[in-house]
């Protein structure tokens, strides 16, 4: 008798050889029938339990092998296992002819996917050492370089990007505050092989297919120039803290500059209303202000955003006392309004003492100044409202000159050299905290006509929507005012003043005319 080599036959042979003599001896011995039946039943129960455990084990392995099958589910791996016995004595039809037998776990093993090469176990592969760049401490009069990433360097090399160098020069020292230029992304210093790609996200965000219709392509280009261009140098131009920023770039096209490079006027954080004034001017269809954006600069220690206004070299030179290209007193201004100089192409008479400024320009300026309550042009002495202690007219002691208003000189009346008929609105610092019972109606004195394009926008219900859409483009300004909640409060003030202005126009019988001369 040979010993079987299969697991099922081996177990059966072991049980039969071990238990058969004992069962025969037990059956032939003289013992009580009850005890003999109990022992026989116990042995049968043990053997039956063993068979059940073998059946459960085979079913569990078959289920696991089916679940571990390949995800593509090709038919070549589908084998009819329902006809294979548990002990594996019967092979599939295609293997029975050659007399070979099939092990019950052979099919399960072949269903597993095989690796072509062993996997890399974490910790067994030596990591690549990254090259580190040590940033040397810069001297007080030297520039600070920012270490670029290796990925950005490779991207720049792959694109063969030629990064322009910086304008050489020294930073002008202003007072005791340390001003320094931090080299931002997209630049390369001479003598250094550290470079970064020029592409970066602009602070002027346009998520739609096109910009708002009231902003021209030239406006968007100039806004991005002011918001994203690197600063080459700084020149102080006034005691009030206004500085001239020389920006990197070219003055090609219609971008005016202060030499070979474009420039921008950097003002104080309290002048942030100039950004709002620029967008309001474009929405009303006046187009008399210079592009203005809000920006944070690295060389300013407080980190607060400040307005930057485009420097326009085409503006006519201004006098030192009134900051105007033409000297006009309040009395002369009222006479010019009555004469309606250059209206309908009519040449004024010499005795009228008309300037080269068109009559409609005064109406546009008065409407614009009233909405923002700008008093530094038509009411420099603050005679039309109750000023605060921090207002310039109180600080300079000009309030006492209100008794003789006819001799008061207007300020910030600016024209262009090549276009003296039209005004350019500069220094547009507005005031949103002035109550409705303290509005300066002196700004509207003598005005009998108002521009139709602006009045139609004020009468419509779209002023808020347009202001939100336009101011959203300037990300730094939007965030500096507290997001939409803060912008909504500013728009509330403008809407209330617009309703008051419409009431004033109707009450005084002023005409609303198209002013597209």
Curated annotation (Swiss-Prot):
The keyword Transmembrane applies. It is a single-pass type II membrane protein. The chain crosses the membrane at residues 37-56. Keywords: Glycoprotein, Golgi apparatus, Membrane, Signal-anchor, Transmembrane, Transmembrane helix. Residues 57-517 are extracellular. It is found in: Golgi apparatus membrane. Glycans are attached at residues 98, 287. One of its GO terms (cellular component) is Golgi membrane. Residues 1-36 are cytoplasmic. It comes from the Eukaryota. PANTHER family: GOLGI-ASSOCIATED KINASE 1B (PTHR15905:SF1), GOLGI-ASSOCIATED KINASE 1B-RELATED (PTHR15905). Belongs to the GASK family. This is Golgi-associated kinase 1B. It comes from Mus musculus. The lineage of its organism: Eukaryota, Metazoa, Chordata, Craniata, Vertebrata. The gene is Gask1b.
